[in-house]
Amino acid sequence: MIQPLVKASRPRLWVCSDCLLRRTLSPLLRQQRRRFTGFTAHAPKTLTGTIPVTHKNGDTKHDDSLLRSIFDSPETWKQFSGDKHGRNVGLFRNAYLTSPHGFLDFAHVSLGKARALVDKVLNAQSLDEYRAIVRHLDRLSDILCRVLDMADFVRVTHPDQQIQRTASMAWDMMYEYMNQLNTMTGLYDQLVQAMDNPQVSTTWSEEERMVAEVLKLDFAKSAVHLPKDARDKFVHLSSAISQTGTNFIQHMEPKIPYTTVEKSRMMGMDPVEVKRMASMGKVYVQTLSPQASIALRTVRDDHARHQLFMASRTASRRTVHTLEELMLLRGESAKLSGFESYGHLVLHDRMMASTPESVRQFLQALSENTRPQAQQEVADLTAAKRAHKGGDATLEPWDKDFYAESIRQAIKSRQKREDLSSYFSLGTVMQGLSRIFTRLYGIRFVPREPMPGETWHPDVRRLDVVSDVEGHVAVLYCDLFYRPLKSPNPAHFTLRCSRELSPHEIAETAHTQAENPHVLIPSFESAEFAANDGMAYSRSQDGAIKQLPTIALVCDFPQQSHNRPALLSFFQLETLFHEMGHAIHSILARTSFQNVSGTRCATDLAELPSTLMEYFAADPSVLALFARHYETDNPLPYEWVDNKIREARRFEALDTENQIILAMLDQELHSSKAVQGHIDSTEIFHSLQRQFSTAPPDPQGTAWQGFFGHLVGYGSTYYSYLFDRVLAQRVWNVVFNSGQGGAALQRENGERLKENLLKWGGSKDPWKCLAGALKDERLEGGGEKAMKLVGSWGGQRGTKSDQAV
């Protein structure tokens, strides 16, 4: 997701998979493939691991029609989803997960496999054993992540609290073991010894060498290379950082909890809402509330807006102190690990920027590019105020939202009120996404009947992703409808990454029951299924077995009814396209090693595919594929979309400028200033505003940075959102020719992006991937010059009618 740049606080080190050398199948394994007697199974024939390739037009048309119907028609879905009283196949078809306790069984079995791999790595002595170390460590990552990622998803998504609890217990068990591994010096020493031996490292593939570097960096971030005293201090600091970050988020508070305003000064705001907050002629507005934001956009009285603005931009002294304490702890931790600052530490690891100076070059170039349009927008706001107030009134900080809203409302009043959502039924949108991916990448969505126990709620649809060349390539679970207590936040979850399984790994499954006498191992119909825990896999023409990416998309769209399908707003359409961008990255980047599969690429590249999909959501040729009225079947008039985008992006340059300043603040707070033992976050923020803001800066006495919660989860990487937005615009303009002449749907353009960038995941230098996709040699080496170049491209999207080719 930054994913995106987003999305979940998952552990970084042991997160991904394993790819083993492709070897000739042993006679034992061939025998087991004929009938895997170790786990005689009576699974139904529908539990196949693969789907054959089909080129029949009839099948494609049927799948396309059915895809729309299962999302738009409750009756069709009820008939298609079938009988749920058969044999329970387990959640996600993981055969261990047929009951709440199954999570604990799955965790125990996985821990046994993990410990066996750790022993192999620690006891490696021969050249062959050292050559296998990267594969073993990557498989170790996959074993832990099979539990961690599924359990993490289930504990926040599953409606059954008992299953949530056991999933949390399984997660805790694996996370505790993962933390032990992260500081295990023996594993680090063995990896370094393998990397430093040319007789070992020269036999590795490029992908294998990339995984080795990733693992080494992750170990280094855990201070495993330091003396014991330093390691102990690092562990203590890490705990303090975690606790302080949690305190900052949970106890964030304004200096003034409520702002008291004379009721007579609240004209312009919804009178019903004002009355609800009023008492004895006063209005009491909670400082950090939606009502405060609405008031800043609608209340006409300058004095009232000034009061509300000052309160909403001023965090309490305690909150600011906690933030600064967090920055100092991070600085101390980075210094202990041998880095100049926390920013240097973070950017050293799987980031295209590599250094804080590169980030500054990008942000300053982007600021220069954005300034002319931002100045024009400030001039428009000032003109609106003067038209309202008369004379030579100047724009104040508390005026910006009010006059921006008045200009947007004026745009709306000149336009007919269009019902865009009637053209975006969820079924037609899913149908459209499948058609887009078919044209660009040769893959489509095929509805698959969920088996008993496979999904966590009856509303969840399973789609198999089928390639016209490779057959079944991924599994996609769609949990898209609203239900009580469900998280409203849209998200993409990778439940399992791509990974190639070795013949020896598959053969090992015959001993699973003997190695786990206290756990009842499920029955499987083959060794391949056993190695995949019952989940989907594919077999290539050369016989290689790969576990398939398994993905969940979660949204909060309105439920369909018997007489009307679920209809999406344009914002919801963009959201679904964005999340599907993450999914397509996971689907296309089916690498052999899990550590570099799918979205496990450079962190500041992860949001590029998802942000790019937002351009497709606004392209007329793309919308023509599916956007039709759910009752009349009339096509969507594109000018309605153009008007909607124009309204939404009216002050995009000022919004971008604000994001630039926040990204700069993130860099400054994580710079060497935090290593020196004192940091004044308020002065840093105000100084950046004075230097880079075209809009009026916050007045003295405010301290908005105390509300910047993203500093906890995105420390020193907040720039990534802007970076990927600029890159997405460039890819759209260069690779897809801004959609001109139907370029958004041309297969050669999709193949260009896939072959140069998407299919590699994190297995190739991202700058080389980007240079190949854009055919721009200036990017190949990366560094400060490349970052500055990207910043100079700018990031204002505009609308189709004013977009440059």
UniProtKB/Swiss-Prot annotation:
Major localization listed first in the record, in broad terms: mitochondrion
Transit peptide interval: 1-25
Reaction it catalyzes: Release of an N-terminal octapeptide as second stage of processing of some proteins imported into the mitochondrion
Gene Ontology cellular-component terms listed: mitochondrial matrix; mitochondrion
Matches recorded under Pfam families: Peptidase_M3 (PF01432)
GO molecular function: metal ion binding; metalloendopeptidase activity
Cofactor(s) annotated in UniProt: Zn(2+)
Gene3D superfamilies xrefs: Collagenase (Catalytic Domain), Neurolysin, domain 3
SUPFAM superfamilies: Metalloproteases ('zincins'), catalytic domain
InterPro entries, sorted: M3A_MIP, MetalloPept_cat_dom_sf, Neurolysin/TOP_dom2, Pept_M3A_M3B, Pept_M3A_M3B_dom
Protein name: Mitochondrial intermediate peptidase
Organism: Neurospora crassa (strain ATCC 24698 / 74-OR23-1A / CBS 708.71 / DSM 1257 / FGSC 987)
Encoding gene per record: oct-1
